[in-house]
Amino acid sequence: MVWILNLIIVLLIAFMSAYLIRHYIFTLTALYYRGGQPRFIPNGSYQPTVSILIPAHNEEKVIGRILQRTIELTYPRKKLEIIVIDDASMDQTGEIAESFARKCERIKVVHRMKGEGGKGKSIVLNEGLKHARGEIVFCFDADYYPQRDIIEKLTAYFVDPKVGAVQGRVTVLNEPNTMVTRLVTLERIGGYRIDQLARDDLRLIPQFGGT
């Protein structure tokens, strides 16, 4: 029994050491990152149809803010649709989303029933994809507050047929409020300014978040 415990300890130490070395290499790579020349400079001329998926479960405190923001987006209205997937929310999320849908024809609300909800974000997004008609699909979390021109900024890169996915940079709105928000901000900085830069410079597979 003792040897099993010792083996577990050795494996944990080996794993943590390898992980530490990995972070050390990534940090050094990011520090000396120079970046390659862009294959093209997006000019915003490419404007495909876009579907924005917003999965939401008990998000009554923030769903109105994100929907109001999508209405304010500067992307051509006729090429944009917003699909809210209400994942069997027990609060007023669905009702708030429906109130926005009545005011803006670009907003659609898909309701998942009580027995269907709570099975994971991927299932909710797949449900939304069934209703999406856009050439490009975006995913925003319900607590996001995107820049007004975010759609044209990101879709511009898809003019290159070799581009299959694009990810924006997420920042924390209420960074100075609590220790938790400060730690999340630090994690985001490390992810974008170190991890992603190192992956690019080392020609590794990029990491795309779930939103």
Where in this protein do the model-derived segments appear?
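Short, well-formed alpha-helical segments that are part of the catalytic scaffolds
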Residues: 26, 32, 36-38, 59-72
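N-terminal membrane-anchoring/stem segments of glycan-assembly enzymes
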Residues: 1-46
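The conserved acidic donor/metal-binding loop of glycosyltransferases
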Residues: 141-145
